[in-house]
């Protein structure tokens, strides 16, 4: 098996080839990639938690250090100016010595403003990739070369194809997240609050709330009906009905994004509903293959969802086909089936059909679907169907043209549980799909 170091060498060669292509196409001398800068809180002497430029961590696994720079010409070793000030007020990251450092030409940068003197003098024909336009201007980068859209389109599009190194990092992120999910489930079964369940998760992963790739969703009971619930109640509810956890982890800048839902009473109707959504998700994953547009799989799950809703008498007096055709499944599943995953949780280019940036929007019926691409080898996607009882979405349907098909009694009985989401992370390969999450036996 290849080591992470050897996989990184191949990964870097791929990035260099992409850089050569885009530099030649637009007659540029190089890419100047900025890790980013701290952002100060208003009227405060503290900064917001730092989040690095995803294009920086694509080249080097540096994820928490601001004021760093990469110079890429596609031919020579990437030049890395690593910010390492002499500072007794704050902890300072030392110059890295790791599996990847021999592949770059690294120099310590003691002051953030030193970069102007360290960079090559000729910078008029360089593309700046980063978050700070003012800094780019101060370095003499023309506005037209600051995050040029044509360059970003090319880079975004090809980010969908994960190298073997990236896939290996994402498998490691899965392992960390699975440890957290198992600890969180134990905390739920022990009757802990959302706040304490989250602490158990973070402790098990060894990652702080600013290290995980997104704010953890730890939702008990009705809170599971809020798709991005992040409030974290300090007290446990007097009665436990359900637990939805959507929480991830990072490894070398690459994300895992996993969701599970549990019933407090394993013999309840809600537990049976969770089991059926889980089975439907696994059945859909068994059909995944390259060469199929992701929108087709989204529609396929709505067909499966209609069958579940009818089986549990939540929808009545209508066929599966008619329920989907008339949109009756949409208030129960308002989000899309999933999204690209990688350097960012909602990774870029889900709608891009080519490297020029041609877009295909989500279908009108499913406007929150985050991907319309044809699946190809190397793509990493989440598969995260759900079934929710959201008052604001159900109300117009209950009173509308098709209201007679919605079983109010069943819906009212299930409202206290909030909802269900089951999410796995999969890699598309030429001859099949790898479910990284289930391979680690996360039930």
UniProtKB/Swiss-Prot annotation:
Record key words, sorted: Dipeptidase, Hydrolase, Manganese, Metal-binding, Metalloprotease, Protease
Coiled-coil region: none
Cofactor: Mn(2+)
Binding site for Mn(2+) 1: 257, 339, 384, 423
Gene Ontology molecular functions: aminopeptidase activity; metal ion binding; metalloexopeptidase activity; phosphoric triester hydrolase activity; proline dipeptidase activity
Catalytic activity: Xaa-L-Pro dipeptide + H2O = an L-alpha-amino acid + L-proline
UniProt cross-references to PROSITE patterns, sorted A to Z: PROLINE_PEPTIDASE
One annotated Gene Ontology cellular component of this protein: cytosol
Positions contributing to Mn(2+) 2 binding: 246, 257, 423
GO-annotated biological processes: proteolysis
Cofactor binding note: Binds 2 manganese ions per subunit.
EC number of this enzyme: 3.4.13.9
Gene3D superfamilies membership: Creatinase/methionine aminopeptidase superfamily, Creatinase/prolidase N-terminal domain
Lineage top rank: taxon: Bacteria
Family listed: Belongs to the peptidase M24B family. Bacterial-type prolidase subfamily.
PANTHER family reported for this sequence: XAA-PRO AMINOPEPTIDASE 3, XAA-PRO DIPEPTIDASE
Described purpose of this protein according to its UniProt entry: Splits dipeptides with a prolyl residue in the C-terminal position.
Name of this protein: Xaa-Pro dipeptidase
Native organism: Edwardsiella ictaluri (strain 93-146)
């Amino acid at each position: 098996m290849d080591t992470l170091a050897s996989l990184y060498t191949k990964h870097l060669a791929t990035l260099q080839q992409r850089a050569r292509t885009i530099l030649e196409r637009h007659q540029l001398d190089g890419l100047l990639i900025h890790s980013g800068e701290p952002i100060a809180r208003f009227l405060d002497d503290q900064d917001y938690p730092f989040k690095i430029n995803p294009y920086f961590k694509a080249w080097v696994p540096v994820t928490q250090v601001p004021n760093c720079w990469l110079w890429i010409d596609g031919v020579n070793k990437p030049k890395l100016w690593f910010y390492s000030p002499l500072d007794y007020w704050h902890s300072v990251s030392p110059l890295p010595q790791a599996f990847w450092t021999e592949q770059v030409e690294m120099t310590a940068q003691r002051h953030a403003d030193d970069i102007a003197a360290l960079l090559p003098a000729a910078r008029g024909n360089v593309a700046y990739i980063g978050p700070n336009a003012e800094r780019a201007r101060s370095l003499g980068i023309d506005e037209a070369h600051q995050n040029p859209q044509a360059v970003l389109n090319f880079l975004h599009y090809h980010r969908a194809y994960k190298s073997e190194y990236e896939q290996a990092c994402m498998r490691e992120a899965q392992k960390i997240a699975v440890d957290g999910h198992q600890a969180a489930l134990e905390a739920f079964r022990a009757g802990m609050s959302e706040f304490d369940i989250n602490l158990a998760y973070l402790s098990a992963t060894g990652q702080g709330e600013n290290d995980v790739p997104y704010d953890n969703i730890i939702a008990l009971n009705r809170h599971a009906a809020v798709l991005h619930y992040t409030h974290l109640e300090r007290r446990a509810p007097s009665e436990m009905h359900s637990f939805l956890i959507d929480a991830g982890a990072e490894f070398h800048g690459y994300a895992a994004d996993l969701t599970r839902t549990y019933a407090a009473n394993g013999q309840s109707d809600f537990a049976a509903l969770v089991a059926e959504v889980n089975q439907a998700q696994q059945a859909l994953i068994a059909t995944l293959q390259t060469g199929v547009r992701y929108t087709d799989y989204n529609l396929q799950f709505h067909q499966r969802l209609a069958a579940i809703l009818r089986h549990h008498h939540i929808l009545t007096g209508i066929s599966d086909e008619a329920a989907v055709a008339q949109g009756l499944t949409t208030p129960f599943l308002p989000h899309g089936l999933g999204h690209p995953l990688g350097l960012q949780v909602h990774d870029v280019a889900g709608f891009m059909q080519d490297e020029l940036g041609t877009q295909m929007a989500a279908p009108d019926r499913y406007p929150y679907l985050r991907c319309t691409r044809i699946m190809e080898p190397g793509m990493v996607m989440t598969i995260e169907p759900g079934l929710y009882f959201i008052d604001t979405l159900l109300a117009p349907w209950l009173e509308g043209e098709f209201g007679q098909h919605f079983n109010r009694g069943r819906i009212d009985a299930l409202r206290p549980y909030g909802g269900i989401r089951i999410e796995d992370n999969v890699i598309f390969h030429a001859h099949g799909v790898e479910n990284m999450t289930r391979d680690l036996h996360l039930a």
